[in-house]
Regions:
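C-terminal cap of thioredoxin/glutaredoxin-like
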Residues: 1-16, 135-214
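Membrane-interface motif at the C-terminal end of an N-terminal transmembrane signal
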Residues: 17-31
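Short, flexible loop segments at the rims of nucleotide/cofactor-binding pockets, characterized by
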Residues: 31-32, 62, 152-153
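A short beta-strand-turn-helix
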Residues: 34-51, 75-76
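A generic local structural motif
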Residues: 37-42, 69-71, 161-162
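Structural alpha/beta surface segment adjacent to cysteine/selenocysteine redox centers
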Residues: 52-59, 65-135, 140, 170, ...
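Secondary-structure boundary/capping motif
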Residues: 63, 93-94, 156, 184
Length: 214
């Protein structure tokens, strides 16, 4: 009797493990499709580019501006790169407020400029400072806030966090380079040459034939 109970427990745990494995597999597969969607992202680089780089940033992250500047410096040498910047709000309400403001300003054609200004701040800005930067750029802040509300951008920003986690990314800044997740190592963020090497690695991996199964 005890042996049967033990075997039943082992079988239950095995089935649970298999179930979790498939759950995470399909969640990751869906996330890699969702990451290409543009409604919750800011489009940078070449809009028609055939090599997609997704950048996850948090506007309260002190390290995100460093990778953002390196990405910007990389673009002149990588004209085929299309960047989708996906803001997350892992560091609190201010992160979400600023992300909603930036995405809400897209229709005014100045969201990229606002993002750049925020990234150039000496420290992560308050929401009041972000609104000041937006106003200085000629952005109608009220209109951007209303647009964020009407378009349901805040839930989409929260979804960006889910996408990142399902892909396997747990920190910012982080990237998806041609379908390859990348989080900078503890020793530091790579420079322009290091980033271009990662681009080449992702291209090579994409061109490599999948191993045949017998």
């Amino acid at each position: 009797m005890i042996k049967k109970i033990a075997l039943g427990g082992i079988l239950f745990l095995l089935l649970a493990f298999i179930g979790l494995h498939f759950y995470f597999y399909f969640a990751a597969k869906k996330a890699f499709e969702d990451v290409k969607e543009e409604s919750s992202a800011l489009l940078l680089g070449n809009p028609q580019g055939d090599f997609l780089v997704v950048s996850f940033v948090d506007y309260q992250c002190p390290h995100c501006p460093t990778l953002d500047r390196i990405l910007e410096k990389t673009l002149p040498s990588e004209p085929e790169v299309k960047i989708l910047l996906r803001p997350v709000a892992w560091m609190g309400q201010t992160s979400e407020d600023i992300a909603a403001l930036v995405l809400g300003a897209r229709e005014q054609g100045k969201a990229a400029a606002l993002h750049k200004q925020i990234m150039e701040e000496p420290k992560p800005p308050s929401y009041a400072r972000a609104k000041e930067l937006a106003t200085n750029l000629g952005i109608d802040v009220k209109k951007a806030e209303d647009r964020a509300l009407a378009a349901g951008l805040r839930p989409l920003i929260q979804k960006n966090s889910t996408i990142a986690v399902d892909i396997g990314l747990r920190s910012v800044p982080s990237l998806v380079i041609g379908g390859m997740p990348y989080a900078p190592p503890p020793e530091g963020i790579p420079g322009v040459n290091g980033l271009r090497l990662l681009f080449d690695e992702a291209r090579t991996k994409a061109l490599s034939p999948s191993p045949k199964t017998e």
